[in-house]
Amino acid sequence: MNTDNLIAHARARFDHVAARRVLKEKYEAKMLFAHNGGMWRAGPELLVLLATVPPGDAVVLDLYETPVQVNPEQLRGMAMMRWQEQMNAWLVEHEQLNRQR
C-alpha cells in the first residue's frame, strides 16, 4: 500500500469512529424525558430502580437529584417505551453507518 491509500484508510476509520460517537450522543440525548415534575433518563439504571420499588406512590430522585413523588409502574412504562423506541432507532442508524463503512 502506498501512503495515499494509508492516509485515506486512516481518515475513513477516523470518520467512522467520529460518526459513531455523534450517533451515541444523539440517542443518549433522546433518552431524556419529563414526568411528574422531574427529569428522567430512560435506561437500565432507571428501569432496575423502578422494578425494585414497591407498588404505589414512591419518592425517587430524578436526574438533578430532586426528590419526586411518582407512580413507579407508570414511570417504568414510560421509561421502557422511550428506551425501546430510541434503542431500535439507534440500531437502525448504526447498521446503516456500518454498511457505509
Where are these regions (language model features)?
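A preference for well-ordered globular domain cores
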Residues: 1-101
